[in-house]
Curated annotation (Swiss-Prot):
Name the UniProt record assigns to this protein: DNA mismatch repair protein MutL
PROSITE patterns linked to this entry: DNA_MISMATCH_REPAIR_1
InterPro entries to which the protein is assigned, alphabetical: DNA_mismatch_repair_CS, DNA_mismatch_repair_MutL, DNA_mismatch_S5_2-like, HATPase_C_sf, MutL/Mlh/PMS, MutL/Mlh/Pms-like, MutL_C, MutL_C_dimsub
Function: This protein is involved in the repair of mismatches in DNA. It is required for dam-dependent methyl-directed DNA mismatch repair. May act as a 'molecular matchmaker', a protein that promotes the formation of a stable complex between two or more DNA-binding proteins in an ATP-dependent manner without itself being part of a final effector complex.
GO molecular function: ATP binding; ATP hydrolysis activity; ATP-dependent DNA damage sensor activity; mismatched DNA binding
CDD domains linked: HATPase_MutL-MLH-PMS-like, MutL_Trans
Domain of life: Bacteria
Pfam families in UniProt: DNA_mis_repair, HATPase_c_3, MutL_C
One of the protein's GO biological processes: mismatch repair
Positions of the UniProt region annotated as Disordered: 414-433
Organism of this sequence: Streptococcus pyogenes serotype M6 (strain ATCC BAA-946 / MGAS10394)
HAMAP family: DNA_mis_repair (MF_00149)
Keywords (A to Z) from UniProt: DNA damage, DNA repair
Amino acid sequence: MTNIIELPEVLANQIAAGEVVERPASVVKELVENAIDAKSSQITVEIEESGLKMIQVTDNGEGMSHEDLPLSLRRHATSKIKSQSDLFRIRTLGFRGEALPSVASISKITIKTATKEVTHGSLLIATGGEIETLEAISTPTGTKIKVENLFYNTPARLKYMKSLQAELAHIVDVVNRLSLAHPEVAFTLISDGRQLTQTSGTGDLRQAIAGIYGLNTTKKMLAISNADLDFEVSGYVSLPELTRANRNYMTILVNGRYIKNFLLNRAILDGYGSKLMVGRFPIVVIDIQIDPYLADVNVHPTKQEVRISKERELMALISTAISESLKEQDLIPDALENLAKSSTRHFSKPEQTQLPLQSRGLYYDPQKNDFFVKESAVSEKIPETDFYFGAVDNSVKVEKAELLPHSEEVIGPSSVKHASRPQNTFTETDHPNLDLKNRQKLSQMLNRLENEEKSVFPELDYFGQMHGTYLFAQGKDGLFIIDQHAAQERVKYEYYRDKIGEVDSSLQQLLVPYLFEFSGSDFINLQEKMALLNEVGIFLEVYGHNTFILREHPIWMKEEEIASGVYEMCDMLLLTNEVSIKTYRAELAIMMSCKRSIKANHSLDDYSARNLLLQLAQCQNPYNCPHGRPVLINFSKADMEKMFRRIQENHTSLRELGKY
């Protein structure tokens, strides 16, 4: 008797499911890709309990014949390749014949399908990979696959599922990526009876982006295009002012397949050059058409890793396309647009309404003279709206938003304000080592800044400036050269840090509420973690599709920083699963000190230079900027005399050393 046996097919499928089906989103991905391969123009995904209870994918594609239906649950049975040569010219999303058998082996699956050539369709029901029912039924052309009780026979996998909201966010992300890859298909995603995503299927990629990321985001994206003999690159990239805190918004498509590729991500960032702030990433959708012979998708069961021949040439093509597109744009922000974005509003006294602050019990020290507290612009709440159906009070004036080509009219109340994300106003050249995304490095920086000891600064006499960058001063210890940007950065950092003080969680109502748009997956994740935002005084309410409304703001947040501040806090929460006023304010102090400091090649008059040195002398640590760079260097009198050889060396000792 041999010790080596051939595993039963059901067991082999369950083993394969460990690689193919990691979570409910994996099932959605495989079923939707099969629907796309079947040349569907409409695909509807319905889920219950984030896919753990039920996943149903309905399409209007080619369907399967009665004879092919049971074969679809056989491992390595496929209609997409027939010979070895086909493996090197794959244009379909699936080809292994593993997905459906793997899914069927760990769930109960029901398939209804019909082709247009026959008068009736077929029904198949299987549990744990074993077919229980196979019969003829009446059903429309296309395929409907229902997966129920996922992982019912693999409890270990079920145990490690994340929360329902987290799993739902993964599903939304998968559907969004596939809808970007195939704008010619109309996608609909419904969760527990509520529609989360819907695309038009017009074939216009820009329309698909608008449906996923929102109209305001799409308006700030540029078309790119480039090609050579092997590759054709097209898509949309965001202006440098529109960024996110992670790479999740960078979508790379190869022949209609969403892939992950570090080198191509690097090429995208290279295309932006120094226009992006360190730790920030653009919103990008790039479609790459390539000869299948140059791409190997048979690398991993999920098929998200693709190996590409001539990868360096493709990187150069992408970088050039992005850089050329950005060159054609005026990257200087529009002053009128910035004025419109300013949340500082002035009203005559009779129009102001003072409401009592709603105390939430945290300590507030008025002796700090907290400059974030304002006596401005508060009002009663606007009329309540039906958030899911967008019913607005008839007394509220509405105005039409600017429309994209072929898009439906978007109407919104003028009594709300669309929040804009913060723009990047300094680059890597200011601080190449500053990475606000690296929470460990940021924490170390903040700890170092908190533990700084008071230093004694020498008395300096300013006498000149070089190249609009360095200040010269003399003191009793010799010559001092000061980096003017680093000096003012230290001064302003300590100013903003001291102004932060203790915070109060009291709230002040907004005269004009703010609307905050997010992608579908981020919107769902934020809903799950909303209690953490509430702890720091940010109370967002659902307001329509992937949108929150803010009706009141914590008084520790300046009114003009509400839009950027709330987005920053939400990004922090999505990135680290926690929010901290202390960390946010410290980050803000560091960034504000850099952005509002004088730069290199800026000439100072004598009065300004002397005033800067006076302010620097009053700092707790005048010797380093917040990022750790030196503010000034010193040449002592002895150093100067050595450089000019006024101090003679001991010639005898040099002879003894064999130098003479």
